[in-house]
Curated annotation (Swiss-Prot):
Gene Ontology CC annotations of this record: cytoplasm
Domain notes: A Gly-cisPro motif from one monomer fits into the active site of the other monomer to allow specific chiral rejection of L-amino acids.
Motif Gly-cisPro motif, important for rejection of L-amino acids: where in chain: 137-138
Record's protein name: D-aminoacyl-tRNA deacylase
Described function: An aminoacyl-tRNA editing enzyme that deacylates mischarged D-aminoacyl-tRNAs. Also deacylates mischarged glycyl-tRNA(Ala), protecting cells against glycine mischarging by AlaRS. Acts via tRNA-based rather than protein-based catalysis; rejects L-amino acids rather than detecting D-amino acids in the active site. By recycling D-aminoacyl-tRNA to D-amino acids and free tRNA molecules, this enzyme counteracts the toxicity associated with the formation of D-aminoacyl-tRNA entities in vivo and helps enforce protein L-homochirality.
Reaction(s) the record says it catalyses: glycyl-tRNA(Ala) + H2O = tRNA(Ala) + glycine + H(+); a D-aminoacyl-tRNA + H2O = a tRNA + a D-alpha-amino acid + H(+)
Subunit structure: Homodimer.
GO MF, one example: D-tyrosyl-tRNA(Tyr) deacylase activity
Location (main, coarse): cytoplasm
Pfam families to which the protein is assigned, alphabetical: Tyr_Deacylase
Length: 145
């Protein structure tokens, strides 16, 4: 399971012109699910997302986690993170999970996030989404569990 974390001042996801998820300061995470991923992969990714130190402390060092600052978590499914881009000029998606598995694991990740953290929002799995964000830094990390 891949998670592309971006520290944001704010972010929102729209589907069909309607906002389906929004946060203020926090992290936007694009989630790519692969065939070998399991609930354990989702648990490991969630632990990283909530505890990875991406926010600045009083000395300006990235020493604080999402939990510590009480920021928002916006999860957005993005199967293109699992793309094979090594050859040619067109991405291959055979390394992406089938939609049923992807939906199941994304829903699991989202439900666990809502149990573990108070400010959680999400995009809509499989939808054509427009993601708006103000990247803070920019600070971006790619996790691969």
């Amino acid at each position: 399971m891949k998670g592309l974390l971006q520290r944001v001042r704010n972010a929102r996801v729209e589907v069909g012109g309607e906002v389906v998820g929004a946060i203020d300061q926090g992290i936007l995470v694009l989630v790519g699910i692969e065939p070998q991923d399991t609930r354990a992969s989702a648990d490991k990714l969630l632990h990283k997302l909530l505890n990875y130190r991406v926010f600045s402390d009083a000395d300006g060092k990235m020493n604080l986690s999402l939990r510590e600052v009480g920021g928002g978590l916006l999860l957005v499914s993005q199967f293109t993170l699992a793309a094979d881009t090594k050859s040619g000029l067109r991405a291959g998606f055979s390394k992406a999970a089938a939609p049923a598995l992807g939906a199941e694991l994304f829903d699991y990740l989202l439900s666990q996030a809502r149990i573990a953290h108070t400010a959680v929002a999400a995009g809509q799995f499989g939808a054509d989404m427009q993601v708006h964000l103000i990247n803070d830094g920019p600070v971006t990390f790619l996790f691969d569990t």
